[in-house]
Swiss-Prot record:
It is found in: Cell outer membrane. Keywords: Cell outer membrane, Ion transport, Membrane, Porin, Transmembrane, Transmembrane beta strand, Transport. This is Major outer membrane protein P44. Monomer. GO terms for molecular function: porin activity. GO terms for cellular component: cell outer membrane; pore complex. Its main location: membrane. One of its GO terms (biological process) is monoatomic ion transport. It comes from Mannheimia haemolytica (Pasteurella haemolytica).
Amino acid sequence: TTVYDAEGSKVDFDGSLRIIV
């Protein structure tokens, strides 16, 4: 799942709940 944080940076959430910014 890809979302964007408040600053517009892409944040990818994988199945292990790690966050890749």
